[in-house]
Amino acid sequence: MDSPAGYRIHDNIPLPGNLDQVDVHVTRDDDYRIHVLPDVDRAVDALLTELDGRRAVVITDDVVADLHEGRVSAELAARGQLIGRTAIRAGEKSKSLTTAFELIDWLAEVNLARRDVVIALGGGVVVDTVGFVASAYMRGVPYVNMPTTLLAQVDAGIGGKVAVDHSEAKNLVGAFYQPKAVISCLEHLRTLDTRQIRSGLAEVVKKAVIASPELFDYIEANADDLLACASPAIDVLVHAAGAIKTKLVGRDPYEIDLRRPLNFGHTTGHAVETVTNYGPVLHGEAVAFGMVVAVDVARARGLVVPEVADRVTALIRRLGLPVALEELGAVPRVDDVVAALLKIRQIRDGSLRFVLPVELGATVIAEDVTEEEVRAALVRLR
């Protein structure tokens, strides 16, 4: 069933047994721990342990600042460890070089030293942007991710890929730079709206399709509880997603092999985000639609088991995520999405790589997907 221009990857990662922490092995110098904790008290305790007396700055956004930042900064200030705190404007448009340079200017103003720590408290935009800033300032200073959205806890805050967007493409300017620790507080998820929860669930569905049939079954069986962000379902999900991503990233932490199954849904998803100018479509929504496109291409090629194709699309729909162009927040034209994909191909050395599902836990990395195939899929999914 494999595409002649691709290779097949099998995975069957079980749900983790340890629901307190995940240890991440990258290299000898880059290992770190992911803490998944039920409440703010334990999250702050974990942060203080990881800081080990070092001073820190807190960078968040103007929404999270009102919800969660006060407690973190107050605890640091009480111990004489707070250098300063600042907030960027919430939203994808802040994930830019302009914001990054403004933050670097601020770090210089507060005299952040090489041994000091940068704390990224927020969603995907914050952890991506702040991680990039930490990688660049003084050739790299330590940072701790405290992701506050589901998407950041299950994906963006883990793995050490830090970047900002560019008008030409999403995540065009970035680095591989691992955090000192990741501290996820499940209590923070209670403040999210349903759309943000759905966006985060898209990234977990991605991991389930490519690497964990057991997790896919779990999401199907617990979809309503997950949408309600109810325990214990959401707790299991965050732990499982972190464990699965770290295992996959650990095999190729610096993307020496760019053909990775974690990019399932992201080829078209990034094109949609670029076309809609990083505004009305959330990242998880774009990835969800990108997965549906990949499933459609795989079905047209006769690669994917039909039952699996139906289950994946049905689960995405059940979670309230887009399965058609018209269901996106801003409806891009087929021609515009194709044009963005062709630009991505130019940036990525001429190959339009698609991760195509074969069955749950098995994917083909295809490097020969044509413009015509993608256009036909987009037309079918219009």
Curated annotation (Swiss-Prot):
SUPFAM superfamilies of this UniProt entry?
Dehydroquinate synthase-like (SSF56796)
User: Is this entry keyworded Transferase?
Assistant: no
Q: Name one GO cellular component term.
A: cytoplasm
Residues binding Zn(2+): E203, H266, H283
The EC class name is lyase
Q: Which CDD domains match?
A: DHQS (cd08195)
Pfam families from the UniProt entry:
DHQ_synthase (PF01761), DHQS_C (PF24621)
Which cofactor is recorded for it? NAD(+); Co(2+); Zn(2+)
Please give the InterPro entries that the UniProt record associates with this protein.
Dehydroquinate_synthase (IPR050071), DHQ_synth_AroB (IPR016037), DHQ_synth_fam (IPR030963), DHQS/DOIS_N (IPR030960), DHQS_C (IPR056179)
Does this entry carry the keyword Nucleotide-binding?
yes
Annotated NAD(+) binding lies at 92-95, 124-128, 148-149, 161, 170, 188-191
Q: Alphabetically list the UniProt keywords.
A: Cobalt, Lyase, Metal-binding, NAD, Nucleotide-binding, Zinc
Q: How is the cofactor bound?
A: Binds 1 divalent metal cation per subunit. Co(2+) is the preferred cofactor.
What Enzyme Commission number(s) appear in the record? 4.2.3.155
Listed under catalytic activity are: D-sedoheptulose 7-phosphate = 2-epi-valiolone + phosphate
List the GO biological process terms: aromatic amino acid family biosynthetic process
Give the Gene Ontology MF terms in alphabetical order. Answer: 3-dehydroquinate synthase activity; metal ion binding; nucleotide binding
Query: Could you tell me which NCBIfam families the record lists for this protein?
Result: aroB (TIGR01357)
Q: Which family does it belong to?
A: Belongs to the sugar phosphate cyclases superfamily. EVS family.
Annotated function = Catalyzes the conversion of sedoheptulose 7-phosphate to 2-epi-valiolone, which may serve as an alternative precursor for aminocyclitol biosynthesis.
This protein is called what? Answer: 2-epi-valiolone synthase
State the organism of origin.
Actinosynnema mirum (strain ATCC 29888 / DSM 43827 / JCM 3225 / NBRC 14064 / NCIMB 13271 / NRRL B-12336 / IMRU 3971 / 101)
